Amino acid sequence: MALTSAVLGFSTGAQAANMISTQELLQDCKGANGTFITCEIYGQAVYDTYLVTRNPKSAPEFICVKQPAPTRKEVIQEYVKWAEANTKYATEPAADTILRFLAGKFPCGK
């Protein structure tokens, strides 16, 4: 399934059907109806979950944010641009596309 499943061990099927889609999250990230904070919290939760599930043997890191890191707002703005340019992921779980974006933006070993 999606990158999220591989990283976090989620199952497919009904569980995936309950996840927020990328296009749904984009509405929050664009600040529609004053919901930008929802985007910030969701994105931070996905990243924090990624950080605590790292294991060198079974789940090696693939996102390496170099310091000084950009602001959360800057990263969200870049994520919105990325998601709008990658509409093939619009119906995919938002957590998956956040991780895809971060892996491309902050690759390890570069």
Task: State where each predicted segment sits.
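Generic N-terminal initiation segments characterized by hydrophobic and/or small/turn-forming residues
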Residues: S5-V7, T22-Q23, D96
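Short, compact, well-ordered microdomains
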Residues: K81-K110
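N-terminal signal peptide c-region/cleavage motif recognized by signal peptidases
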Residues: T4, S11-G13
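Short N-proximal segments of mature Sec-exported proteins
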Residues: M19-K81, F101
